[in-house]
Amino acid sequence: MENHEQTSFTFEIDNFLEKGDAISPIFISGGCEWFIRVWQIEDHLAVTLSVPNLESLRYGWERRTKYSFIVLNQSGRELERTFEVEGLFCTELLEWCHPKVMPTNKLQEVCLENNKLIIEVQVKVLEVVHEGGVTTEKEMFNIEGFDVLYTQVSRVSWLFVEHPNIAVDVRIKNQLVRTAYINVLLGLIETLDRSPRSLSETDLRDAHIELSELTEAGFKVDWLKKKLEEVSLARKNDISDGSQVEELEEHVKNLKLELDNEKIKSSTASERVLLLEKEVLDLKIELDRTRRGQPNLLYLKLRY
């Protein structure tokens, strides 16, 4: 594995608060070209390390690096520093971002001095592959001391960007066991990202077991514990709301059935009333005929 000296590049941005987004000139580190982008994401300052001039790179190129970002004031004093992250750059992964380098409110205080923002990036290139074969899904890469599949590189790298201390207390040496724990961690994250309603009691029970195993192995997963509690509560509320809906639907169904029965009864009663009214009318007609001396047809019908 190649091991180049760490190099630094400083990017000074005038009037950054007005611009909100800036891209640095290209610089060289480890014999490779790089550039950084600085911009604001919601309430934080974000910085990205990227690879330029892709058309000049050969098929199968890869770069493995360690990098960190530093925010400086006009006097060169360090105000904020990100954790050092190991990242793999390739055709599918052209850049890596630190989305929360500094809160925006603190950034405004920094930029008050001559309205200038200064970002320093420290890059150490660990390995460069200028040309290679086709990368397969089963190929393994080492990210922060853990062997992971090529298809997992992006997720694991981002995991260490967002939670840089997650594995500092892991003392397991066996690489196969370390890989197994990373797979458990990724699976747990995927489970908790699902809709609470879609999770079963078994899913939640397994999630608690996996969380306990990760904690015992030394992983710092308090943020996942909190998320598991939130998901469990959300599922409980969803089930409760769902039960109420089912009860209401059943009540509506019963009321509709009762209403249909009443309509049938009303229809039958209406027919009976009409029949009686007709009989009364017939009786009145026969009564009038009798009074006029005409034969009483109703009487004859009843007699014969």
UniProtKB/Swiss-Prot annotation:
Q: Does the keyword Coiled coil apply?
A: yes
Q: Which SMART domains match?
A: MATH (SM00061)
Mark the transmembrane ranges. Answer: none
Which Pfam family is an annotated match for this chain, by its short name?
MATH
- SUPFAM superfamilies registered for this protein in UniProt: TRAF domain-like
Ranges for domain MATH: 6-123
Q: Which residues form a coiled coil?
A: 219-292
Q: Which UniProt keywords apply?
A: Coiled coil
According to UniProt, the name of this protein is MATH domain and coiled-coil domain-containing protein At2g42470
> Which source organism does the UniProt entry give?
Arabidopsis thaliana (Mouse-ear cress)
Q: Supply the source organism's classification.
A: Eukaryota, Viridiplantae, Streptophyta, Embryophyta, Tracheophyta
